[in-house]
Each structure stands twice: as C-alpha cells, then as structure tokens.
Amino acid sequence: MQGNLPPEAQEKIEELQDLQETAQQVAQQKQQAETQLRESETALETLDDIEGDTQMYQEVGELLIETDYDEAYENLEEKVDSLEVRVETLTKQEERVQDQFEGLQEELQEMLQGGAGGGPMGPGGPGAGGA
C-alpha cells in the first residue's frame, strides 16, 4: 500500500511511526513515575501519623535495614521531590513529541493532497481512494 507513495511520504510515515513509538514509551514512563509518586506521597502521609521513636525499616534492594524516623522521612521527601521533577519533565517531553507528531502529520497530509493523489492517508480530497 505504501509502495505507490513518493519516497518523501514514505519517510514521513516512518517518522510518524517512530514518534508514535516514542510517545508510547514516554507515556508509559510517566505513568510509572506518577504511580511511584503517589506511593511515596502516601508513605510520607503515613509517616506523619507515626511517632518519631517508632522502630522503622527501610527497603534497600532485597534487604530491610533499620533506620530512624528522621532519615526515613528525609529520604521519602527527596524521593517525592525527585519524582515530581521527573513527572514534570516527562509531561513536557510528551507535549513536545505530540507537537512534533501533529506537525509531521500536517506535512504528510499536505504532501499527499498537493503532490501525490490517491494516498491512503487522511480524509483528504474528493476521490482520494482510487488508483
């Protein structure tokens, strides 16, 4: 189906596919970061309800290491701050990829409507499904 498209249009389609894949990866990373952020915020709220002299353990890899309240609280605050920055960065990256995708899509539609007729893309011009 892409065989009868001009090479420039085929390149744009490949770029669109790459951008779509990138957008999916960024969205997945953002979702994971948001989940970790919610979990960390919940843990911080839980720490607020615990007395400072309560015996605590922190997960380090496969181990649970004894820690004190202040250290646990500080570590969680740092993690929340870091995750907030990560989510913000991924949101901006998601927007950039979306803008690139839309721009490339417009270029492709113009290319197909202006140059090569009968392309498979878009709800474009009249009679745009023929040979």
From Swiss-Prot:
Hydrolase in keyword set: no
GO cellular component: cytoplasm; prefoldin complex
Keyword Ubl conjugation: no
Pfam name, any one: Prefoldin_2
Low complexity: bias regions: 20-35
Record InterPro entries: PFD_beta-like, PfdB, Prefoldin
Gly residues compositional bias, start-end: 114-131
Keywords: Chaperone, Cytoplasm
GO molecular function: protein folding chaperone; unfolded protein binding
UniProt region (Disordered), positions on chain: 19-41, 112-131
Compartments it resides in: Cytoplasm
Family: Belongs to the prefoldin subunit beta family.
Quaternary structure and interacting proteins, as annotated: Heterohexamer of two alpha and four beta subunits.
NCBIfam families tied to this protein: gimC_beta
Function: Molecular chaperone capable of stabilizing a range of proteins. Seems to fulfill an ATP-independent, HSP70-like function in archaeal de novo protein folding.
Protein name: Prefoldin subunit beta
Organism of derivation: Natronomonas pharaonis (strain ATCC 35678 / DSM 2160 / CIP 103997 / JCM 8858 / NBRC 14720 / NCIMB 2260 / Gabara) (Halobacterium pharaonis)
Lineage: Archaea, Methanobacteriati, Methanobacteriota, Stenosarchaea group, Halobacteria
Gene it is expressed from: pfdB
